[in-house]
Amino acid sequence: MAENEHFRNGIDYVELVNQEGHTFHYICRAGNMNELVDMAPVILRNLDLLFQYDHEGRQCTHIAAEYDVSNAVMKIELLVMLGADINSRELKFGNTLLHIAAGTENYQLAEWLCKKPGVELGAINFLYKTAYHIAYERQNARMMEILRVNGAVCDDPIDIDESDETSSESNEGISI
């Protein structure tokens, strides 16, 4: 009964548990869909959860996209239904979900995002790159085709000198 009481009031989900954020961020990162669905009433009572950043400048949608590739679409779809911003940017590089999908080679997420009304298909991050630029630099023909076929902005990036500092920056394994 005590466990159900904690779940109902949501305190366990909104308190910081470590430097990586709170339990809600953990569920977005590594939890299963049932945990996220069960948490929906707590989220609806605490909508600010959807917009809080973790220690690396990521919101819940960015965390799901980057760390739970196999469940990213389902998690993000639920989070957006609950009120998350599908076009939000993480704070480190200004990447959107589409940038993250290109960087993690999450073809399913990229295709879903491209077909979702309201998604900024030509969003430019802080390094002046679109999702297509990331796929182009990684020579990921499959991702480039998904973006091209689904109407994303697909201009070939200007070749940048390899010694340029910005070309070697990375974000948790997502070199952009």
Curated annotation (Swiss-Prot):
Biological process according to GO: cellular response to tumor necrosis factor; symbiont-mediated suppression of host NF-kappaB cascade; toll-like receptor 4 signaling pathway
First and last residues of every ANK repeat: 56-88, 93-123, 127-156
Listed transmembrane segments: none
SMART domains per record: ANK
Gene3D superfamilies: Ankyrin repeat-containing domain (1.25.40.20)
Pfam families on file: Ank_2
One GO MF term attached to the UniProt entry: NF-kappaB binding
UniProt-listed PROSITE patterns: ANK_REP_REGION
SUPFAM superfamilies per UniProt: Ankyrin repeat
PANTHER family assigned: NF-KAPPA-B INHIBITOR ALPHA (PTHR46680:SF1)
Protein family: Belongs to the polydnaviridae I-Kappa-B-like protein family.
Role played: Suppresses the host immune response through NF-kappa-B inactivation. Possesses ankyrin repeat domains required for NF-kappa-B binding but lacks the regulatory regions required for dissociation from NF-kappa-B and degradation. Therefore, prevents host NF-kappa-B release and subsequent activation.
Name of the protein in question: I-Kappa-B like protein G1
